[in-house]
Amino acid sequence: MDYVTPAGFRDVLSDEACMRERIARDVQACFAARGYLPIETPTLEVMDVMRAGGRMPGSPFKFFDASGDLLAMRPDVTLQVARMCATRLAGQPGPFRFRYMQRVFREAEGRMQAQAREMTQIGVECIGEAGPQADAEVVELMAEALELAGARGCKLALATVGVLRALLAASGASAQWTEQVLAAFHASNFVEVDRLTGEAAAVPPVFAAAIRALPRIRGGREAVEEVRALVAPLGCEDGLDDFARTCDLLAEAGLADRILVDFSVMSSFDYYTGIVFEAYAPELGTPLGSGGRYDNMIGSYGESRPAAGFAFSLEQAMAVAAAADRSVDDEAARPLRIAVPKGSLNADTVAALEAAGLDTTGLDDPGRQLIIRNPGVEYVIVRPTDAPAFVSLGAADCGICGKDSLLEAQSDVVELVDLAYGACLSLIHI
């Protein structure tokens, strides 16, 4: 018998535990200095109670208690804080500022069972205050906390969901089409956004064009005005003035070089109503933290209050800090690494890479080689179904696979472009 931990769980030995303790102390002291008070929420929640607050990540552990209630181990803390405020603090004037450091439990993506299913979430929630000042406060606090956690030099990508929601509402789109567009934005699947807003779009062309263009807008403070020019003729500037003011406040706080306005940022949680933001580090392929404004969520449980907050993964922040300690020169010298599929997709893939100007020597007949190294690029030869996992886990910078493999993997990757080859013929035998 192998005496091992369950998949997605691990032991933490003394050296790492001491580092976690130090980070927790420094970050919590930072939050406390801003007036945030500690809270704790239960590990288990009634499933229907969590669902009432909006879409959430899946919990890997669900079971019935003796009363017949379906319970789940918490996948997120924000929903619990909203429930607590609406029930335990009903009638109290506020505002409230809360901080926490708690374990959360997430389902592994697709077949990636080695992925962590237990992680430590550090965050704050500012309850009862609205407007740019409160939004800037939580963004600034996240930047400061990540610095203290060792994830220095992170970039914060900001947007506001109000513009997209206003475009969808004004377009006259059906509820089904609106849900499809929102799902594509939440998944950062802009190939799907392009398809939905193409020639057969279910909305007037001017709205389809605006929705299609929105996630391509990114940059500094000037990007806000680019969005305004896009949506003002359609009367869809919802939340843009507040967002612009928030960006100005962050610049005044000295964060101008850390902030990126990026309207492709739309959280996978559907409960956000205003500003949304994500923290990125060059050492990590996925966001290490995110947050935003969720003014409607507390009202789902009772008394409505405006609210904003953020959370980040302690483990991911530590991974960024460890990666940053490695030689910058070694990382800069590493070539682009692409996961290339074997089999029927190989010939078209080689042609596409050649058209992009890459050296594909040896790629058309790799034999038993697993890695082909050419000037400026490395090719990792994989099964088509494995390409998403290689990218998600950092073994490749990008990859090529079929749409079916991408959907089946359910990995945290972004579909950049449809290469328009490899379509399969489906046969039904009767």
Give the ranges of each region predicted by the language model:
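Polyanion/phosphate-binding surface patch
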Residues: I39-L71, M119, S426
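A ligand-binding cleft/hinge motif common to bilobed small-molecule-binding domains
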Residues: P388-A389, I400-D412
